[in-house]
Structure formats: C-alpha cells, structure tokens
C-alpha cells in the first residue's frame, strides 16, 4: 500500500506499508530511505522479524518494478514529443530574456524542450515555459540524466552546469561543451558518469550555481 507524505507535493506516494500478517507490519518512506518494522511480539520475536524482512524485500522489488515501468513509459513519451517537435523559436520569451541562442532545443507549443539522456538514450525532457518555469516529464528517470550544449567529441575540457541556460551561456562565452545536470543534487552523479565515459586527459569542471545562501540549499 502507498500513501502521500506530508513533506512532498500531493500525489507523491512516497510512503508505503505492508501487513503480511496480524503480527507484523512494515512501513517506510522511499525518498528518505527509511524503513521500520512493527511486530506484536517485539524485536525478540525471530519469526516475526524474518517475516518483516521478507515483506520489506517484496515491497522494494515491487517499487523497483513500478519505477522501471514508469520510466520506460516516460522515455517513450519523451521520444514521441522530441520527434514531433520543431526547432525552437529564437524569439521565445525565455531565450530573449536570457539573451541566448536556442542551440539544439526544440519546441512544442510554447514549451522549450531540453533533451535528457542516460547511457546515450533519450529518457526524459525538461520543459521550459515562457515564464521560466521548468518541469521534467512526470515519472521519468532523474538521477544521472544530463543534457548537452555543444559537442563532447574532441573536447579537452568539459563543463558541467546545473541549468540549461547556465550551460548555454558558458558554451557561448567559452566555446566549451557544457553538460546540463538540471540541479545541484544531480551534479555528482553526472560528473561520475562523465568521468567514466571521457578519456582521462579530458578535464571536467563543475560550474555550479553560487546560491549557497539561498534558503533550502545545502
């Protein structure tokens, strides 16, 4: 069974619980990595504890299967949208406000589309609206995905930025390929994957946003 947690938006369904018997209940929160067991016999009941571990394992396996299915569905949607979209309008309000060229962006209605890749496959899209709001497609892979402004082939140095606009501005100013990690939480995962892919003599520089004093940032 799944339920919403109070610290996330409505519909998040990050909480879960299973009751394999009248003597055992297991609950947890996926986004926090928390899992707790409750047994009528207390922790000293080995049979109940074993039952709780098995129930938790089954819950994890079910959750992982659901995630894979949803991510595959979102990836298919991303590919359909990307294929059907046209080149981004250089006069799009977001681009004119940022004074940036569209580069490889595409556009669907009023939304700019930033392609996000994982292991070379298009798995998600970040939508940028005219007012600057940014939203990925629902249910898509998030950790380790990245976009790109410029080309990696032949590069001696590669930059990793958080947002697309920062990456595009760096590319235009420095002529270097700039990878889009989307947010600070994804910088490390993207950097590690990029390091594995690129030759050892290619330098990688993190160009993180200087917003450490913003409320809620680490």
Predicted stretch roles:
Residues 57, 61-149:
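Conserved phosphate/metal-binding and DNA-contacting active-site motifs used
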Residues 201-214:
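Acidic beta-strand-to-loop metal/phosphate-binding motif
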Residues 108, 181, 207-209:
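Conserved beta-strand termini and adjacent loop/short-helix elements that scaffold enzyme active sites
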Residues 73, 111-200:
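Phosphate-handling DNA/RNA-contact segment within nucleic-acid enzymes
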Residues 30-32, 117, 128, 209:
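Structured loops at beta-to-helix junctions and adjacent beta-edge loops in soluble globular domains
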Residues 189-193, 213-218:
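Active-site-proximal loop/helix of nucleotide/amide-processing enzymes and allied scaffolds
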